């Protein structure tokens, strides 16, 4: 029915935005500073479940990795010996789309001298890409804001809202646009981008609050970041 179609559109919008966001990993230069302690080499993994088993990895997770040339270029942008991971996680029942929540996660790991700079410049890259290509795939609102949820140890974490136009295809009852938070953490080994979407909230035009998204990002980091 109409509800299912609208949910499909929201999922489609999230997928598009996630694809853009993942491209942001690799311009990591510019200004910024951080005083994050270095707790030794870590890598990123994509376990079958995260957040206490609440979210399960989607069937199509991890298909679209970065190309060798992207990873090679990344060394010049501040990540030494970079490797990448990405996955989509879902909770809820597919037969009841409005009960579902989705987490889009992408990251790189290697050696990062300045985590704050890396986070700032991922956001700056997304903004410059949007300025070049227009807002058809989403418009970043305001500026990235730092969050420090409980459980965030030794990392910089910032979130920024992204507005996605749903267009006429959303129908008369669906939202004309949807705002979703994009959160990025940085430490001396890993950079992670997290986009949580609650589909029931998304139908009202707001996928999640930045505070909730920051909290989820901090929890997810604990699940996907392990000693190298």
Where are these regions (language model features)?
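Short, low-complexity, polar/charged sequence segments that are solvent-exposed and flexible
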Residues: 30, 122-127, 202-203
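Hydrophobic single-pass membrane-targeting/anchoring helices
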Residues: 1-48, 52-54
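Small-side-chain structural scaffolding
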Residues: 13, 21, 106-107, 192, ...
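A small/polar (G/S/T-enriched), proline-flanked helix-loop surface module common
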Residues: 50-52, 56-181
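Extracellularly exposed regions in secreted/surface proteins, prominently low-complexity, repeat-rich
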Residues: 144, 149-228
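Alpha-helix capping and helix-coil boundary motifs
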Residues: 6, 114-118, 208-209
